[in-house]
């Protein structure tokens, strides 16, 4: 079997030195890089910006990201801008991300939207390996990009797989395929006349139905203020999943920020930091 040639790859390990979380074993090459950590508002939790220096994902691109959190480490990861998937007439784009979270560690991954343009084909496979007492908050936003005919769903497909393991046991397998050629995405059971999809996972030992009810109460007013749909469900473990349907990226971002803020205030007793990207 031929060795995989990566368009970009990145490895990052975060550890706790007793006072704050620091990075080591940083490696990146080609189209992916990670900027030096920022400690926003003098927080002990570093924020890392992951950058695609090419500006977008092109036909045949392959990406690999591996993040390790050692015991008691905490980190916030984000992108510097939207992930743009351009047309892929001959092949497709693949991205593989693995997150290994050790005891009592916590990772926030708050990404910018994935924008699939006309005739784009995108596959992403995320693997999360947690311990019983580690935690994570992860988000995805999927949006259609510009098309020559002005229609919303002109990409070929967006296929996202998320696998979550706790102590090596598979607890969540989320296999999402959005393929306009095979299904009417604006129909019932899919996007239902909406164009933008937001998702989030939160895994933590303190998550139970009461916590989920409180999260839903914190975001319920958005459905009165905006044209959107919000669903929150308990996972088959101590965690929850959020799904949002709407027609604007900004609405999804506002809702996910509210969820993240509630989590940080309730469990970690701190405010979330504004991720400056301008």
Swiss-Prot record:
- Per the UniProt entry, the signal peptide is none
Give the highest taxon in the source lineage: Bacteria
Q: Where in the cell is it found?
A: Cytoplasm
| One CC-aspect GO term | cytoplasm
Q: Which UniProt keywords apply?
A: Chaperone, Cytoplasm, Nickel insertion
Is Chaperone one of the keywords UniProt gives this record?
A: yes
**To which protein family does this belong?**
Belongs to the UreD family.
**Subunit relationships:** UreD, UreF and UreG form a complex that acts as a GTP-hydrolysis-dependent molecular chaperone, activating the urease apoprotein by helping to assemble the nickel containing metallocenter of UreC. The UreE protein probably delivers the nickel.
Q: What is this protein's name?
A: Urease accessory protein UreD
Question: Could you tell me which species this protein originates from?
Answer: Staphylococcus epidermidis (strain ATCC 12228 / FDA PCI 1200)
């Amino acid at each position: 079997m031929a060795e995989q040639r990566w368009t970009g790859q990145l490895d990052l390990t975060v550890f706790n030195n007793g006072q704050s979380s620091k990075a080591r074993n940083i490696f990146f090459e080609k189209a992916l890089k990670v900027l030096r950590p920022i400690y926003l508002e003098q927080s002990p939790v570093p924020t890392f910006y992951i950058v695609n220096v090419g500006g977008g994902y092109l036909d045949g691109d392959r990406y690999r990201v591996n993040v390790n959190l050692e015991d008691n480490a905490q980190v916030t990861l984000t992108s510097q801008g939207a992930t743009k998937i351009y047309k892929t007439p001959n092949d497709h784009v693949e991205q593989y991300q693995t997150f290994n979270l050790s005891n009592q560690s916590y990772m926030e991954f708050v990404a910018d939207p994935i924008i699939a343009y006309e005739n784009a084909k995108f596959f992403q496979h995320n693997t999360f390996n947690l311990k019983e007492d580690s935690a994570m908050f992860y988000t995805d936003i999927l949006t259609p990009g510009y098309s020559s005919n002005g229609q919303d769903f002109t990409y070929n497909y967006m296929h996202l797989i998320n696998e979550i393991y706790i102590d090596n046991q598979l607890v969540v397998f989320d296999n999402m395929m959005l393929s306009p050629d095979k299904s009417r995405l604006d129909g019932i059971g899919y996007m239902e006349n909406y164009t933008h999809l937001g998702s989030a996972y939160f895994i933590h030992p303190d998550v139970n139905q009461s916590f989920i009810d409180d999260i839903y109460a914190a975001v319920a007013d958005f459905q009165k203020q905006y044209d959107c749909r919000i669903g929150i469900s308990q996972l088959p473990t101590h965690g929850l999943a959020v799904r949002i349907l709407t027609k604007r990226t900004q609405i999804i971002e506002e809702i996910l920020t509210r969820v993240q803020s509630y989590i940080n205030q309730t469990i970690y007793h701190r405010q979330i930091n504004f991720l400056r990207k301008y």
